[in-house]
A protein has these predicted regions:
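Short proline/glycine-enriched turn/loop segments at secondary-structure junctions
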Residues: 54-59
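Active-site-proximal, acidic helix/loop segment immediately C-terminal to a metal-coordinating Asp/Glu
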Residues: 2-51, 204-207
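Generic structural signal for well-ordered alpha-helical scaffold segments
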Residues: 49, 53, 184-185
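Short hydrophobic alpha-helical segments used for membrane anchoring or interfacial signaling
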Residues: 67-72
Length: 239
């Protein structure tokens, strides 16, 4: 990881909370304490800027720039949202999905059950993982992240929009424990490329709700566009 910063960082707090600003050695120690092989460039930059704001008592007395670059390995993330239109395609779809390298994320209760059946395991709901806004997550052995479907994806979109609008939002997002936040972090800070497999099956219970099939497809297309804007290579397939 390479960290470059302007004098606004080293001068942070001068005459306010410190006598001579934020000492270079202290900055280096801060970076080392907050570094891990998985911490994103945006998270590191936001952490440094947050400390500058604290030292300046939120006044930001000097122009401050932080640039962080990180060399990392490729990390594909494969996301299945909804089961295929025909149950006859379940087996081939699962083989396609799990045949891809990288992490595997499953969104939706029906999808989770189909995946668990294919893997020969059970779906376990994670107690306490839900909020008023986001349904609880589940756990499937062999799957990296399992969330509820369209409601979670809808909130994930909001999280991604907030992330792209405000570079400091990563610090808030990192402390959220719901499925939408975890999904947003995986897509934004872990994935180098995203493969979305969108199931064409209709959910009759949602036909007359705000989450009709057409709306779900539109939502997933918006997710693709937002991730592309975030610099991800995104491929979307409909099954």
């Amino acid at each position: 990881m390479l960290v470059i910063f302007s004098a606004g960082v080293s001068e942070a707090g001068r005459g306010v909370t410190t006598d001579a600003g934020w000492a270079r050695q202290d900055i280096e120690d801060f970076i080392l304490r907050n570094y891990s092989p998985t911490v994103s460039s945006q998270r590191m930059a936001a952490s440094i800027l947050s400390t500058v704001k604290t030292l300046d008592m939120d006044a930001m007395h000097d122009d401050t720039t932080v640039v962080v670059a990180r060399l990392r390995e490729r990390c594909p993330v494969n996301v299945m949202i909804g089961p295929p239109e025909s149950k006859d395609d379940d087996l081939s779809t699962m083989r396609l999905f799990f045949g891809k390298d990288g992490k595997h994320v499953v969104c939706g209760g029906t999808t989770a059950n189909a995946v668990a059946s294919y893997l020969g395991v059970k779906v376990h709901t994670l107690p306490g993982s839900g909020t008023e806004e986001v349904p609880p997550m589940s756990e499937i052995h062999g799957v990296d992240l399992t969330t509820e479907g369209v409601v979670t994806v809808n909130v994930t979109m909001k999280r991604i929009k907030d992330y792209l609008a405000d570079g400091m939002y990563t610090l808030e997002l990192a402390h959220m424990k719901d499925g939408a936040s975890k999904l947003a972090l995986v897509l934004l800070e872990e994935a180098t490329e995203v493969n979305v497999l969108f199931g064409n099956a209709s959910n009759l219970a949602q036909q007359d709700t705000e989450f009709s099939f057409e709306r779900k497809l539109q939502l997933v297309q918006e997710l693709r566009d937002m991730l592309t804007l975030a610099g991800k290579t995104v491929k979307m397939s409909i099954c």
